[in-house]
Amino acid sequence: MVDRLANSEANTRRISIVENCFGAAGQPLTIPGRVLIGEGVLTKLCRKKPKARQFFLFNDILVYGNIVIQKKKYNKQHIIPLENVTIDSIQDEGDLRNGWLIKTPTKSFAVYAATATEKSEWMNHINKCVSDLLSKSGKTPSNEHAAVWVPDSEATVCMRCQKAKFTPVNRRHHCRKCGFVVCGPCSEKRFLLPSQSSKPVRICDSCYDLLSTGEMTACQSTRSDSYSQSPKSSLNDASDDDDDEDSSD
């Protein structure tokens, strides 16, 4: 089915429309063999709060961006190679329902669909695309992924020392290894995580100690799936993705 659509006029036209919606700031998406499988609006759990994002699933990449004008204009394009993607379902809790984790070596995050059916369709299609890619390349699924960041709203005090209260002056930081929200004194060290950056990145003292002694898997297990067990914030929308990163770090 996918191979048959690859060179069809309809597929080429659909991809061209997506390119036009992102404009000159977006990357070209039309390449031989690429097929647009589906698209839709998902709620992405960003650092500050959940936000609506437009997602496009291709047979080899997942693309998403900010919605400026629905079906007409998007910005801040992100492209994720599906070959490195793994996904895990998230239990429903509060206003956040029908969600799953999208995990990659460079970045991991949670998204939520409007209905359980939509969630199932997205997950099935993503898994099928990943499986087909790995089958063709002969590669094995990636077992390394970046931590999912705990949203700011879920931590009023540092998740490491459990003492420092966050204020406009004592601001929040995120450990790039475990994803915890931590204070400045608990995250003064940096460590090179090649899958995330070519430069050393901010990590918490706990992860630094484990990484320095070579216990990287132990460090990851401290994060575990605590994200899916922590309380969730209410749904909101915003116009940009600036708060996905610690801009000052």
Curated annotation (Swiss-Prot):
GO molecular function: phosphatidylinositol binding; zinc ion binding
Bias kind Acidic residues: ranges: 238-249
tRNA processing as UniProt keyword: no
Record-listed Zn(2+) 2 binding positions: C175, C178, C204, C207
Skewed-composition ranges (Polar residues): 219-232
Annotated segments matching region Disordered: 219-249
Start-end of FYVE-type zinc fingers: 152-212
Compartment(s) of residence: Early endosome membrane; Endoplasmic reticulum
Keywords: Endoplasmic reticulum, Endosome, Membrane, Metal-binding, Protein transport, Transport, Zinc, Zinc-finger
GO biological-process terms attached to the record: endosome organization; endosome to lysosome transport; protein transport
GO cellular component: early endosome; early endosome membrane; endoplasmic reticulum
Location of the PH domain: 35-131
Stretch forming the signal peptide: none
Cited CDD domains: FYVE_PKHF2, PH_Phafin2-like
Location (main, coarse): membrane
Membrane protein topology class: Peripheral membrane protein
Domain topic, free-text comment: The FYVE domain is important for binding to the endosomal membrane.
Protein name: Pleckstrin homology domain-containing family F member 2
Organism: Gallus gallus (Chicken)
Gene that specifies this protein: PLEKHF2
